[in-house]
Amino acid sequence: MSLFEELKWRNLITECSDEKRAKLLLDGNKKIKFYCGFDATAGSLTVGHLVQIITFLLIQKKGHFPIVLLGGATSFIGDPKKIEERKLLDPSQILDNFNKISLQFKKILSFISFEIVNNYDWISKIDVINFLRKYGKLFNINYMLSKEVIANRLKKGLSYAEFSYMVLQSLDFQYLFEHKNVIMQFGGSDQWGNITSGLELIRKINKIKDNDKPVGMTNALLLKSDGTKFGKSEDGVLWLDQKLTSPYKIYQYFLNTEDKEVVNYLKSLTLLSKKEIINLKEENIVNPQKRLAQKILAKEIITLIHGKKIFENCFNTNQALFVGKKDQLSEQSFYFLKYTLNYIEVNDKISLLEALVFTKLTNSKNKAKELISNHAIKIFDQIVDDTELILNIKHSLFNKYILLKKGKRFNALIIFK
């Protein structure tokens, strides 16, 4: 299977400006430079960006050279949102975001060669007069108005600043084409209008022969089971920065992937081969209760983002929660759980009844007594039958944490200050 065919099979190509040319570039003997852009409008990448990262890695594996473009300039404006105007960020915030995202890419892509560029380096050098004369004259207003996101926002109001974003982003492709011999751009499907505008700008400025023609393509946006995307502005966003989203929360999310979604996620979020993915699909059909595809999916994603050691901590934490293996809990496990479970902080002691109510494992002390009497409550992996029990640091692990369990699915923490 060719690289182009593999990307299509993985649903990593939705739109393509020239499929014949893309096949030639991706599967030819000549190695190319390609890029994808990311704005620094937040201090972390999200799970949704893994689609682009996997695309990077698959194309790089063929020997092509990837460039990560960070929008140090375009982040001052922001890509038009579907519904409302973006709030402008302070320059210091953009710089901080830029530095954090740069570090994330260097960590996640540490095992390959790639380059990070900042579009502030060239866009900031263009004055207003030259911007309008050299570039503004090349953009037709009717063409820009035909773009879906612009057309939708016009009904609700759109500033000139956000309207100009398309022009600014187009400069990126033109600059990289001219100065770094970049021949291909890809991005999320919501970037198709900006990508084609960049191709159009290159065509108008440069006298291009067929064998120098650049190509643009898009990936389908990563969607949750409810149809919403994993975006920065969405509710329940899953950040790749473990200070913002616990790795265990991401692990749990993909461990709970529905059967109808798991194969699509394996294709677009992992580097597993087609044969491996098909085998996992068949295994899930034969033994759905084992959920092997979901387990491998969660493992691959956490290992890519955070490394093998943190995956092992996530796995052990899950074993302790749902299989009852207390000895597999590490201090880092509790750090993960603090950002995943309900918890209460206490000074030296608390009654079990109060703890069950305060952590919302139940809504009353009477109900708590009933649960204890029915042997439905555990401290770590030990069933509790004493309704008068007072919990203190002696019951804890690492002199700090107590794990409360209700049945097989519900857990909470007590943390000693």
Swiss-Prot record:
A motif ('HIGH' region) lies at residues 40-49. Residues 350-416 form the S4 RNA-binding domain. Keywords: Aminoacyl-tRNA synthetase, ATP-binding, Cytoplasm, Ligase, Nucleotide-binding, Protein biosynthesis, RNA-binding. It catalyses: tRNA(Tyr) + L-tyrosine + ATP = L-tyrosyl-tRNA(Tyr) + AMP + diphosphate + H(+). The keyword Transmembrane does not apply. A motif ('KMSKS' region) lies at residues 229-233. L-tyrosine binds at residues 35, 165, 169. Coiled coil: none annotated. This is Tyrosine--tRNA ligase. It comes from Phytoplasma mali (strain AT).
